Amino acid sequence: MTSEPMIISPEPGRRGRAVRGTTLVIGDWTAEGADREVAPLHVHHADDEGWHVVSGALRFRFTGRQVTAPAGATVLVPAGTPHTFGNAGPGPSRFIIILPARLDELISQLHASEPAEHPEIYRRYESELLE
């Protein structure tokens, strides 16, 4: 199997795009809304996840502590670490998210399902809702 590297040119004004390889996804996302968490506290038992804040600020909540990551900060959450995150301010925050392809699939399934289905979806991806 031959793989070719991808070079993605910037596209002004475009939001929410992702570059997907076989095992890694790099997404350019914007968090709208003031001080709102994206998901309940959860854990990915087998996968790391990372964010780089481009503008604005993100608030991360871990078991027992909270951290605000301003523009320019990079946050790596190792597998097995309970976490959630959200926009920390009144304006939008733009960030790059780096995650395994299967966590991107998990997120897609969550967005396409009802909340009652979420615990089972997390389990299928070696993840767990904690709240």
Give the predicted meaning of each segment:
Residues 5-41, 47-48:
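A short glycine-rich, His/Asp/Glu-containing loop-to-beta-strand
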Residues 22-23, 31-36, 57, 66, ...:
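Short, charged/polar surface micro-motifs in flexible loops or helix N-caps
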Residues 27-31, 50, 72-73, 83-85:
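Hydrophobic/aromatic beta-strand elements that line small-molecule binding cavities or substrate pockets
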Residues 28-31, 43-61, 98:
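Short, conserved beta-strand element in jelly-roll/cupin
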Residues 50, 57-59, 66, 82, ...:
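Structural motif
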Residues 60-61, 77, 83-89, 94-97:
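Short beta-strand His + acidic residue motifs that chelate non-heme Fe in jelly-roll/DSBH
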Residues 64-82:
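Short acidic-glycine-tyrosine-enriched beta hairpin
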Residues 88-131:
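Double-stranded beta-helix
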